[in-house]
Curated annotation (Swiss-Prot):
Species of origin: Bacillus pumilus (strain SAFR-032)
Function of the protein: Catalyzes the transfer of the enolpyruvyl moiety of phosphoenolpyruvate (PEP) to the 5-hydroxyl of shikimate-3-phosphate (S3P) to produce enolpyruvyl shikimate-3-phosphate and inorganic phosphate.
Pathway: Metabolic intermediate biosynthesis; chorismate biosynthesis; chorismate from D-erythrose 4-phosphate and phosphoenolpyruvate: step 6/7
Binding site for 3-phosphoshikimate: 19-20, 24, 164, 166, 312, 339
Protein name: 3-phosphoshikimate 1-carboxyvinyltransferase
Recorded catalytic activity of this chain's protein: 3-phosphoshikimate + phosphoenolpyruvate = 5-O-(1-carboxyvinyl)-3-phosphoshikimate + phosphate
Catalytic site positions: 312
Encoding gene per record: aroA
Length: 428
């Protein structure tokens, strides 16, 4: 796809439903007793993979666009799949599914695409094995395909070496099926969508700032879920509104969960002109309307605990930093190396092609601004949706046209991303 320099971005858009919450709404609805209705579901490729996996285990799921109805019969009624469970490109699906399957008394095999085959799973299979799950795979359970035979689990206390919502969620979902209490402690709090939604489904948890405990044997009761807009998707247009001259964009019903709003903190610190109007907190998840307009920005250091609250937004933050006066340093973000791509390397290589003054570091990157981006280059998403969208926004401020390869990757989390660019600028 070739994108030319655009006019100012102005308008009101509804950001697609949150990917993390959409995944969990299907998973928890599938293992609950009763019918769960989900509104504003994200019909992206990743979340559709989650639906497909549960259908293969006998769960009746109706999906029409952003509406999903899940007819759950409880954990014990999941059926042994006759085929492999293919998670596609979805790391959330495979890691949370492992937690569910760890306690199911049948055999299952999890596979994914080429990207998933390269992503490390030991960080999840390790604690699940401690609970008693039988999991095997390439490199002793490090890589897919993963073979799981669930069964009797016993609660554990586990200290996670990293703050990861996927590790935490997998352990809690296994702990739900274990004998006794399971406790997970992490270095600092990761996103808490699992805890919020389990509570919505009637599960009791014991939480403090860095740990969460769950008592095994609890059952989930069906409920209705409203999925707010995904702040990780909103981040692309928050940055666009900040750096495209003479722009003003309103983003409706965006999730404002405090464990996800690191991008808002960074924008404010850099001097962005951002207004927040909190609207509601349906389903335990706060959301509101965000208004962003063009402003002068300054470079900052981004490191420490905030990284886990904005890890998925770092590619677009890197673009933001190219248009800020001074140097922006991103540290403590080595987790980027094991995403859909090595996002440190891909962000640096692709932005350099456009003329950015950016360099990779061991655990992040250093960006010197303010730098006019030239464009006139061919860049690629390398199959990574967040890289593809970052490049789409970058092309809105380059002096020359930019050709982006593999733009289909954005369908994973934001199927109408380029349509929203077209609407806001009236040209693509």
């Amino acid at each position: 796809m070739k994108i030319h320099k655009h006019a100012p971005m102005n308008g009101v858009i509804h950001i697609p439903g949150d990917k993390s919450i959409s995944h969990r709404s299907v998973m928890f609805g599938a293992i609950a007793n009763g019918t769960t209705v989900v509104k504003n579901f994200l019909p992206g490729a990743d979340c559709l993979s989650t639906i497909d996996c549960f259908r293969k285990m006998g769960v009746d799921i109706e999906q029409k666009g952003t509406d999903v109805v899940i007819h759950g019969k409880g954990l014990k009624e999941l059926k042994e799949p006759s085929d492999v469970l293919d998670v596609g490109n979805s790391g959330t699906t495979i890691r949370l599914m492992m937690g569910i399957l760890a306690g199911c008394e049948f055999h299952s095999t999890l596979i994914g695409d080429e990207s998933i085959a390269k992503r490390p799973m030991q960080r999840v299979t390790g604690p699940l094995k401690q609970l008693g799950a039988k999991i095997d795979g390439r490199a002793n359970g490090e890589y897919t395909p993963l073979s799981i035979r669930g069964g009797h689990l016993k609660g554990i206390s586990y200290e996670s070496p990293v703050a990861s919502a996927q590790i935490k969620s997998a352990v809690l979902l296994a702990g739900l099926q274990a004998e006794g209490t399971t406790t997970l402690t992490e270095p600092h709090k990761s996103r808490d969508h699992t805890e919020r939604m389990l509570s919505m489904f009637g599960v009791k948890l014991d939480e403090d700032e860095q740990s969460v405990s769950i008592e095994g044997g609890q059952t989930l009761k069906a409920t209705d879920i409203f999925v707010p807009g995904d702040i990780s998707s909103a981040a692309f247009f928050l940055v666009a509104g900040s750096i495209v001259p003479n722009s003003r964009i309103v983003l409706k019903n965006v999730g404002l969960n405090k464990t996800r709003t690191g991008i808002i903190d960074v924008l404010k610190q850099m001097g962005a002109n951002l207004e927040i109007n909190e609207v509601d907190a349906k389903g335990g998840e706060p959301y509101g309307d965000l208004t962003i307009s063009t402003s002068s920005l300054k470079g900052i250091e981004i490191s420490g605990d905030v990284i886990s609250r904005l890890i998925d937004e770092i590619p677009i933050i890197a673009l933001l930093a190219t248009q800020a006066e001074g140097t922006t340093i991103i540290k403590d973000a080595a987790e980027l190396k094991v995403k859909e791509t090595n996002r440190i390397d891909t962000v640096v290589s692709e932005l350099k092609k456009l003329g950015a003054d950016i360099e990779a570091t061991e655990d992040g990157m250093k960006i010197h601004g303010k730098t006019p981006l030239q464009g006139g280059a061919v860049v690629s998403s390398y199959g990574d949706h967040r890289i593809g969208m970052m490049l789409g926004i970058a092309a809105c401020i380059t002096k020359q046209a930019v050709e982006i390869e593999d733009t289909d990757a954005v369908r994973v989390s934001y199927p109408n991303f380029f349509e929203h660019i077209e609407y806001l600028t009236k040209t693509v």
